[in-house]
Amino acid sequence: MNAGADAVYMGGKAFGARQYASNFDREEMQKAVYFAHMHRVRLYITVNTLVDDSELGELADYLLFLSNVGIDGIIVQDLGVIRLARQIVPDLPLHASTQMTVTNSEGVKLAAEAGMERVVLARELSLEEINTICHGTDTEIEVFIHGALCVCYSGQCLMSSLIGGRSGNRGRCAQPCRLPYKLVNEAGEDLLSGKDAGQYLLSPKDLNTLDILPQLIEAGVTSYKIEGRMKRPEYVAVVVDAYRRAIDSYLGGDYQVPEEDFANIEQIFNRDFTTAYLLERPGREMMSDRRPNNRGVLVGRVVKLDKAANKATLKLDKELHLDDGLEFWGQRGWSCWHYCDITFWQNGQEVAVAAAGFAGHYRCAAWH
């Protein structure tokens, strides 16, 4: 909220698609509603898993609580949840989750007829398709503009159930797409051996739309969604702040994104970035096959490495401080990780901060 969000979505202890997050109990939710509304921010709750018959009684009680506590709306996937909500809490606004896989204007119309005030479109649509949908309906349209992507269609995945024994459609995704795999033929031979390919064949890059945000605004999108659950508060604050300022600069008639904002977003977390389906680039360009987690930012190069002396000669492009984390990569595929807990040396003197342009030595406890 402090970073400029107009609305926040979060999950409760049940029926949300992030069951391994800490989430909010009912008392915490009441406090969150009060806090959000005090700051004139809307608060939406995810009720976006598939629901069993045995859970309908619990769900009905939960929906009544959400309505009574003053939630501004719920995000839903299951058709049964929609019907039940319309019956017992008809005034509670409903938003169609991206997992409802709405991909065209007729789907938006059907969702509206079912009582949806807003539709979160499938993440696989292009800018042109989003434009067509927005101009063909009066229903509010929401799209994801930043965050993790799923290798399966709008998150509808059975891999987690088959490989990890945990259902991604029930909020318990084990993220098997972030694991290493090999592509082999019938003889078991690695088809990608020796080629320019990493091990993480199913791991997508992160979505980043700062470069094309004006086009999304001009397409008529109502709401811009940033994926942030199970992310650190610092990540959410940095990303929301950057997009808030970007949107405001567009509305002010002069769209600019400072290089500092690009750098901050890249540094806080990235698997490398892509515009993916929005610019119709769904192939290898959107995959992060070399690593499935935060890759950090390039800060410089190793000019010389002396493993015996635990010393590296560095040429830095960015400033480094003590306690920064460094990951070293070799041309032959090896890598190692260090925290900057040993000082830098420049011209025979210890320095606590290595500025951009630094050319000197970095010592660590051991290389491995």
List where the protein language model places each region.
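Surface-exposed amphipathic alpha-helical tracts and adjacent flexible/coil segments at the periphery
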Residues: 1, 7-9, 14, 39-46, ...
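Active-site beta->alpha loop and helix N-cap motifs at the rims of alpha/beta catalytic domains
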Residues: 14-105
